[in-house]
Amino acid sequence: MMRGLVRLYGLLWLGLLWFGLLQFGLLYLASISVADEFTERILFEEDTDGFKLYRIPGIVVTAKGTVLAYCEARKFTEADRGEIEIHLRRSTDSGQTWSPAVQVAHLGERLPRNPHMPEKKKSKNMGGPDEQTVNNPVAIVDRDGTVHLLYCVEYMRCFVIQSRDDGVTWTSPVEITRAFEPFREKIDWQVIATGPGHGIQLRSGRLVAPFWMTDYDGRLPLTHGVGVIYSDDSGNRWQAGELAIPRGGEPNIAELSDGSVIVTARNTDPRNRRMAAISPNGATDWSKPIFIDSLLEPGCMAGIVSHPGDGVQEHRWLLYCGPDTTDRAHQARRDVTIYASRDDGKTWPIRKRLHRGPSAYSDLAVLPNGDILCFYEQGVEQRHGDRGRPWAYRYLAVARFDLEWLLKPE
């Protein structure tokens, strides 16, 4: 009888132990699930690796699922011009780990400086005569596995390089500045700049890159605006589309559910709302630009991306990110917020703050499993720090989240 009781107690003890381990395992899995709804990692930090500042983020996911995060690496100053390189980090595990940063784009011949710049910047340190600005990287992912990276040099010449191994190696640069020349009929530009952010490939196979241009001398009535260039032969030849948003700047682009294309743009209008236009083919026949009442515009670059959703609904999700403020002072850029539309941008009923505090430029990408990546400029309040004011550019951070996180109330 004693032996039977011992065995019974032993079985009870094992049962309790198993039950406890099971409960612990379920709690652990639940905690992992909650934690993984939103994660964030710092990819670049100011005053590291010999560079003063990292700005102007862009992010894409390749056909094989590799994440490419790229930016401007500003060597000596925080300014938009000077010695600036394009740096890239790669992730082959959906953003959990990242390769070291490498310089890409324009590693060969150095080009002369652009003598034209805004009047307000002439008194600032924009670099010496031997420095070179490589600016505004814009990647486009091709379904055939190629990644096309467009960028500008000195805000006046445009080049493209290609990678067929998910950003490990790149071809030599090919200049495509001639594709921008037809726009001189409307804006006699002295400055061109792709994106920033990313471009897109349409269902038709067309590659589309948005850009902005400026004429500082006012030689024609229209002095600045947003247009697109495109390629219908896998990036071998680039040509001009049409002016999409007069008086717009720093555009982003996405394909809508019906195959049409939306471009939205930064602007200086006192309504402080994002401007948008739509084209049936991503290049021509742009609609008259409108202001999107739900999307605040403080004079800042923003990100946009099309999301397939559950694949069942007729309309895709359209996601947008930008600062949640209308204060146009650079030190006031803050509270980067994600907006979501289920009707191709007609309404934006869903919004959620991604970062509380100083934050600015941002870009969006979608992983193969539907999770969303936001690569953005993140800062600190620093009210009593070195600058004595909020600073939105200390880090470049990549946040990963899913639609479930986005739909939960703050």
Label for each model-derived stretch:
Residues M1-Y9:
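N-terminal secretory signal peptides that target proteins for export/translocation
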Residues Y9-A30:
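Bacterial N-terminal signal peptides
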Residues A35-E410:
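Asp-box/BNR beta-propeller blade signature and adjacent active/binding-site loops
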